[in-house]
């Protein structure tokens, strides 16, 4: 039986991917809500959708099957039946702050009045207070911010499908995300894996589920080979979560090495894949801003120890660590912005390091990062650049916007 999830590298030919087309959620908020929702700007939706459609069509033209999170979610709920749909809605309401009470009941009645796809779209897009024809009479509602316009916040980060879950081998992690604005997102993926006919009862391994206090996000999880992962110790992924998933992988899979890479804990470099990506068997992009004197950075190579314990080896020479882990004689670390501190900073901010490999040496990038793109071409890469003026306002690039489900083995 062919597994519906099969990812043994960052660079194997991309056969199936999951995207989320930007919808009302990316403009259904005001500037004073941006910090709460982890956004820096409000995209112009019609152009963002055109750009995303261009991205999806680029993938299709290169032989990739494109699936959509919003459609899979609705199909999974329909596949699961009425009880699954009710349980999903109760969990979503609880994670939105409504376990019981009149507001809970009104939201539940309203959302269940919609067909399944419309319900999913509404949850993703946010439920405003003026959409429900009732006056809250419970203490919870009375004590809330009277002028806040939403009962349920929109989820504008959903088009970054990379983060709520991560495909690893013939399984995945379903992630407990760091900030409240994104924590509900992984409930969609949990539902898809459990109930969608494409994934349910197919023997998929869940290496780590979303029911943890420690946090991890898919932008920090890179599958370097069928034995080696790199995971960022970042603003969004904690060291204890990395140890947890390493233990699970070592016990139940063929993965036997995890390289933890510590990066600056800030919004511009929120995930490892915003500063470091694998693009060929021996080529990587790297943002110079994460490297210290002599090109050093803190890494810990984690391997199985005795009696289920972990063995850690701390090193600071990233190039040597990668060569040793991947059995390479040499490798090519290609600096974002050609190493120029101004260009590198600007292009990293606009996801110049966030490349998506769709085959060995073939990458999809944002067209706005023209210095980095030209440098990749000079290093022998085939670069397919896509439109990016509005999509980039969300602070995520082609890798962020895609969750590979199936890649060919190398």
Swiss-Prot record:
EC number: 3.5.3.6
Superkingdom in the source lineage: Bacteria
Major subcellular location class: cytoplasm
InterPro entries reported for this sequence: Arg_deiminase
One GO CC annotation: cytoplasm
Active site, per annotation: 400 (amidino-cysteine intermediate)
SUPFAM superfamilies hit by this protein: Pentein
Biological process according to GO: arginine catabolic process to ornithine; arginine deiminase pathway
One MF term in the entry's GO annotations: arginine deiminase activity
Keyword terms, alphabetized: Arginine metabolism, Cytoplasm, Hydrolase
Entry keyword Cytoplasm: yes
Name this polypeptide is given: Arginine deiminase
Provenance organism: Levilactobacillus brevis (strain ATCC 367 / BCRC 12310 / CIP 105137 / JCM 1170 / LMG 11437 / NCIMB 947 / NCTC 947) (Lactobacillus brevis)
Gene that produces this protein: arcA
